[in-house]
Amino acid sequence: VSARTDRLVSAAALVLGALPLWVSTHLPMVDLPQHLHLISALHRLEDPTTLYPQLFAARHELTPYLGYYHAVSLLNWLVPLDTANRLFLSAYVVGLPLSLAFLLRGLGRPTWPALLALPLAYGDNFGWGFINYLAALPLALVCCGLFVRALTRTHQRRAWAAALALCLATVLLFHVQVFAFLALALPWLLLTTPVPEDVDARGVSARLRPRVPALLGVVPGVALFLAWVVLRLGQPSEVETGAPWKAWGPMLSPRNLAWKSFAQNRAELLEVLANLFRDGSDRWPLYAVGAVAACALVLGLVRPAPSPEGPVARLRMPGLVLLALGLYFLLPFDIRGYTYYLNTRYAQLAALLALASLPVTPPALQRVLRLASAACALPLALVFGQGFRAFSREASEWDVLVEATAPRPRVMGLIFDASSRVVRHPVFLHGAATLAQARGGGTNFSFALTPHSPLRYRGTPPPTFPSEWRPQDFNYATQGVAYDHFLIRGAPPSRVFGARLQNELSVAAQAGESWLVRRR
């Protein structure tokens, strides 16, 4: 009965963890409008009622973003796009604790700390809309669990190794930065995980033989990664010093790398775990997690239970934590022209692994800790549900502008103020993509410009200013003539267009801080 109760409590916590994704019309994720626009274009690439066939073509090459875009596009055949995306995000939120439990069970450790992962699903990476990266995290934890099983489950090694091969390749198809963590994590697990045959093994070959299936399981993923590296690095990178979104020099040259100081990284390590809402309310679920973890740490020291792991195997989880922290503190923030916001993303992974490293306590205490961990989902559902609904009310200005947008629009986003009163991230930055996606049009800035997108422009991309962050560089004569809709936020249209507003342009709608200007 107690085991059944534990399962019901855990299931309820998982439902509460994903609930905030379903209580609001809009989600506060900076890049989400861009993602949905590209998925819509991918799904309707041959739809003549849209601009997509004219603007975009499939990029028939290996890119690390294929996983998210194609998964949601497939779901879109069954349900509307927004619902498909929420189902995908729900799978990520629920998958985070489930994958952590899978890893812990493979290591022979108690699984109750996995539920503490739920509040960590909604942090800085979520606010920026790094959905590909987020989706790769549960898959990476599953890879670690599969790798350990391929080493230790003597009669099922081939099956676990085959599953590992598939999962590792899938990680790469979601995000290469998570794959980079596994490039360090799997060798560490190989070195610290004993196999049953070690007891009687004599010589290197005898120790290596039972590990061969696990090693073979990583070969397809590594081969896929090398193929992508050759393809990516073989493409010429456009070098323009000082230009946004372009390399400033050779890939790893000092001028092409942007760093955060150690002090800044240290200060942000805990902050980025809960920095979504301006009122700081999202810290309360994290405080609850911290309180449970602190109690578990004290109980593990005062009333320790025999560890199921040997002295070397006991180092596996702390080692994984140190690897994630090393990536956080030692990597650059940007590799210009290649990848951005690099090191800060690993804070979430380090925190997840740290929670999984809590000391083992007696079974009776583990049940209490499981209930306490599940209880952390209550403030999570309340705080994030309220916060998401508050943001959705603010973002309803998009809905008004969509109604005033014509079919097949060419929308230029001029976002002078991307900020929100509710969330800290600049969530209104890509509002033009929301209008374009709703009406089957195009925008002045699209992720189709990036080499990791599954789509590319058919011809020359539409003219625009160098960075979506700098609308003050907009030039109507050379850029504006290519568009028939203009989304302006944070500045009156008269300041942007002057006399043209009375002649060739007119205000079609205004809501909140945004205006929609259309060509007459």
Spell out what each predicted region is.
Residues 128-136:
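Short acidic/glycine- and proline-prone juxtamembrane loop motifs at membrane-interface regions
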Residues 37-44, 56-81:
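Short hydrophobic/aromatic helix or loop-helix immediately within or flanking a transmembrane segment
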Residues 22-34, 46-48, 65, 167-319, ...:
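Transmembrane catalytic cores of multi-pass membrane glycosyltransferases
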Residues 87-107:
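Transmembrane-helix motifs of polytopic, lipid-linked glycan transferases
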Residues 289-292, 356, 360-385:
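Signature aromatic-anchored transmembrane alpha helix within multi-pass, membrane-resident enzymes
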Residues 391-394, 401-491:
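Short periplasmic/luminal acceptor-recognition loop of GT-C membrane glycosyltransferases, typified by
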Residues 149-169, 205, 209:
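Short hydrophobic alpha-helices at membrane interfaces in multi-pass membrane enzymes
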